[in-house]
Amino acid sequence: MRKLLLILLISTSSIASSQYNCEAFKMMEDTCKYEACKYIEKAKKYFQLRKEYHDKYNRALEICPDYHPAYKAKSTAYLKTGDFITWMKLMNKAVELSPLDNLDYRGWCRFQFFRDYKGAIEDIERLQDVVGVNAGFGQNGMYHLNVARALCYKMIGERTKAIQIMEDHLQSDFMTGLYIQYHLGILYYEEGQFEKALKAFESQTKEYDFAENEYYKSLVYKAMNQSEEQKQAIKKSLETYKEGVFMNDVYAHQVDKIYLIEVEEEYARVFQE
C-alpha cells in the first residue's frame, strides 16, 4: 500500500510547481497535507520569482507546517536566482520532513549545479538504501540517478568504482538515460582500456550519436595509432557539432562536455600532422 501511495504522489509531481496528487494524501488519511495540497491546487498560478508565488506556499505551510512540497516549490525560485544558501535551507527542511520524496531532487541538484559530489553520493545512496538501485532519473530526464552517482565517484577520483557502477547498471534491466555508454567509454579511455572504450563509443553511436562521442572516439583511434579512423571520427565530430547535435544543458556544464572550439582545435591538429 505504501508503494502505491508513493507512486501516486510522485507520478503527478512537478519540478516547477511541486504539485502532488492530493488524493494520495487523503488515502493516507493525512488531512493536514490534503488540505494544504487542495489549497495549492485551487490557488491562482504565479511565476516563481513573484512574491505572490511565495505567499501562496507560505499560506499552505500555515495550513500544514509539515507540507514538504511547499518547501521544495519555494526552493526552486532560489535555485534559479542563484541563492543557493536559501535553496539548501529549504530543501534540507523538505528532506527532513519526507526523505523519500526529496532526496532525489536534492541529490541531483548537488551533482548538477553545485558539484557537491560527495553530498550527491550521500543523498542518492541514502535513497537507494530504501528504494533500491533503481531510484529514478535526475530532473533533466537525461540521467538515471545511478549513472549520476557513478559520475560523482569519477569526479572525486574513484574511476574504478564509477566503472563498476555503470557496468552493473548496464547488466540490469534498468533504463540508462542518454549518455551512459559515452561516459563509460571515457572512463575506459582514461584508464587506458582502449578496446573497451571503442566498444562503448560504438554502442553509444547505435543508441544516440552526437559530436562529443565522435570526438572521444577520435582520441581512442589516436591512442591505437589508427590515423585514418582518427581523421574520420574527428571530421564527423566537427560536422555533427555544426549540425547542432551535441550535449546540451541550458542550466549547467555537463560532466565530459566538449565545446566546439575543442573539436576545431583537435581537427586542426589531426589534419596538420
Residue spans of the language-model regions?
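N-terminal leader/linker segments that initiate helical-solenoid repeat arrays
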Residues: 19-72, 81, 89, 264-272
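Terminal, low-structured helical/coil segments at or just beyond the last alpha-helical repeat
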Residues: 20-23, 30-31, 160, 164, ...
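Flexible helix-coil transition and linker loops at the boundaries of alpha-helical arrays
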Residues: 24-28, 58-62, 92-97, 128-142, ...
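Structural motif corresponding to the intra-repeat A-B loop/turn of tetratricopeptide repeats
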Residues: 47, 81, 113-114, 156, ...
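TPR alpha-solenoid repeat register
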Residues: 70, 102-104, 137, 145, ...
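TPR/TPR-like (Sel1-like) alpha-helical repeat modules
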Residues: 95-99, 111, 122-130, 205-209, ...
